[in-house]
Amino acid sequence: MVDNLEPLEPSLQNLVEQDSLKWIFVGGKGGVGKTTCSSSLAVQLSKVRESVLIISTDPAHNISDAFDQKFTKVPTKVNGFDNLFAMEIDPNAGLNELPEEYFEGENEALRVSKGVMQEMINALPGIDEAMSYAEVMKLVKGMNFSVVVFDTAPTGHTLRLIAFPQVVEKGLGKLLRLKMKVAPLLSQFVSMLGMADLNADTLSQKLDDMLRVITQVNEQFKNPDQTTFVCVCIAEFFSLYETERLVQELTKCGIDVHNIIVNQLLFLQNSHDSCSMCASRFKIQEKYLDQIADLYEDFHVTKLPLLEKEVRGPESIRSFSENLMKPYEPKAKPKE
């Protein structure tokens, strides 16, 4: 009987101890504390993994604020840590953000291939954003981090991120099928401009290499031993609704999800000591916590507190991250 089963551990300890994981996504509705949770998870992982990378794919780039340190599109070591790195990417940048070295070649024609690829990719709806992720994935895989944590944008962007390997596989497949038709035209065009012949094979080899990496990533994303998703929510109707939608979409995409963080909870020790608003909020949260318990009885549900002060800076995150590993218990108030 299901009722006789022990409830799952209410923490993220299961993820930290699963050393086969390569990709961990953290996402949910805007304003629920995803960045604090993803940063805290990365800190805990850094205790047991050789090297950890946290990537922000949210255009707001809150991990710079969370760690109180400026990050860029290049992995940078987080202050106070030896093996934790962070980077921020713009998911809307597409190929414009790719490094120039990627397009370097022996002839001048190859150097114009960036513009050619951009035009070809623009003809395939939805692939521009996906290609940005694709190149990041290629770079990240080459760096051999033990585990990568994604601090994702609000739900809509997140679902596109999850789907990007399939989008890129389809798009690159189309590009490669088109190459034999397009290459002769390009060769004529560049010869008219007095440039050297365009080496179409060199260009298509780059696409082939990227497709190989993306196919590999796509397989890993659908492997629960290597990829999982952590949903972050608060105990309110709209957040719970968004979480259920996200869980269903992830399941449809074949992405593993078995951890939910409920953030910003009130832990009232004595209802007589609380103000009427706190008592009211506490009752509302209790109602939605009961619904979460019913909906996600086969999930690890981690409950995190609403704090008096914001969580900012490496030491503050390090301290808060302990709440991911063992259930939060409010400190007893000193007697007056």
Curated annotation (Swiss-Prot):
Role played: ATPase required for the post-translational delivery of tail-anchored (TA) proteins to the endoplasmic reticulum. Recognizes and selectively binds the transmembrane domain of TA proteins in the cytosol. This complex then targets to the endoplasmic reticulum by membrane-bound receptors, where the tail-anchored protein is released for insertion. This process is regulated by ATP binding and hydrolysis. ATP binding drives the homodimer towards the closed dimer state, facilitating recognition of newly synthesized TA membrane proteins. ATP hydrolysis is required for insertion.
Provenance organism: Drosophila yakuba
Recorded GO MF terms: ATP binding; ATP hydrolysis activity; metal ion binding
Keyword check for Transport: yes
Top EC class of this enzyme: hydrolase
GO biological process, one term: tail-anchored membrane protein insertion into ER membrane
Intracellular or extracellular location(s): Cytoplasm; Endoplasmic reticulum
Summary of subunit composition and partner proteins: Homodimer.
Name of the protein this chain belongs to: ATPase ASNA1 homolog
Keyword Cytoplasm appears in the UniProt entry: yes
Residues binding ATP, per UniProt: K29, G30, G31, V32, G33, K34, T35, T36, E236, N263
Top-rank taxon, per record: Eukaryota
Pfam families (alphabetical): ArsA_ATPase
Entry EC number(s): 3.6.-.-
Protein family: Belongs to the arsA ATPase family.
Main location: cytoplasm
Annotated binding of Zn(2+), by residue: C275, C278
